[in-house]
Amino acid sequence: MKILMLTWEYPPRVVGGISRVVYDLSRTLLKDGHEVTVVTYKEGDAPEFEDDKGVKVYRVNNYMINPNNFIDWIMQLNFNLVAKASEIIATEGKFDVIHAHDWLVAYAAKTLKNSYNIPIVSTIHATEAGRNSGIHDETQRYINDTEWMLTYESSEVIVNSNYMKNELQRLFGLPYEKINVIPNGVNMNLFNGIERDYNFRRKFAMDNEKIILFMGRLVYEKGIQYLISAMPKILEGYHDAKLVICGKGG
């Protein structure tokens, strides 16, 4: 299967978790025998094209007269993504499916779908309402509406938890059978052969104590506040538990 990945971030550009998800997913799909092409934003000195161990990666510039307007910047990026994808289709043939990652590439995905009759599969990594506990201004409303449009235009929608599945159904009225729960994968080979460093561990807890480790951005949507508020209850059952938080933000 020929798969087109549309994403606004791909290594070396890392804004959040989408970059790593698309990177790992693309390489895994390639190993399963699929042909994967990524079209993304070019940041800094990243090459406009590279063959990343079999994954074809195309990066587009996104010059803007008024770069301070994020929505305009995103719309210009979508225009450039469409132009690059159309160029690839003209030289290498049509893709079998478009995999769009979040609202940031929604209009590019929709345009390519309608222009070339290519189905969309979208992954919704988070929602604007979920990030902000509701919709409070016009920018958030625009993003929320774009998320709805992407899920409407998609043949299938992917989320990584049942919580997100319920959230999409509640926010956008999607039929349950259209939403597929596929948790983000973990490459366990990365942990093979790693020796435990007990001296490092002792910086945070004694040998007989349990460690609860949180790793992630320290922002509301990651839910670290719930873990912190739950600690008194956890300590009732596990008196020797320690919570270690690693991340940036706040």
Please report, for each region that a protein language model flagged, where it lies by residue.
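Glycosyltransferase donor-sugar binding loop
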Residues: 186, 242-250
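Nucleotide-sugar donor phosphate/pyrophosphate-binding loop at the beta->alpha transition
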Residues: 118-121, 129-149, 170, 196
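N-terminal subdomain of nucleotide-sugar transferases
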Residues: 1-46, 50-56
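A short helix/loop element that forms part of the nucleotide-sugar donor recognition site in Leloir-type
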Residues: 192-205
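A short, charged, and often flexible helix/loop element on the N-terminal side
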Residues: 55-86
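Carbohydrate-associated surface elements
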Residues: 42, 163, 185
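Short His-centered aromatic/hydrophobic patch
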Residues: 100-105, 124
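Conserved donor-binding/catalytic core segment of Leloir-type glycosyltransferases
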Residues: 4, 206-222, 228-231, 244
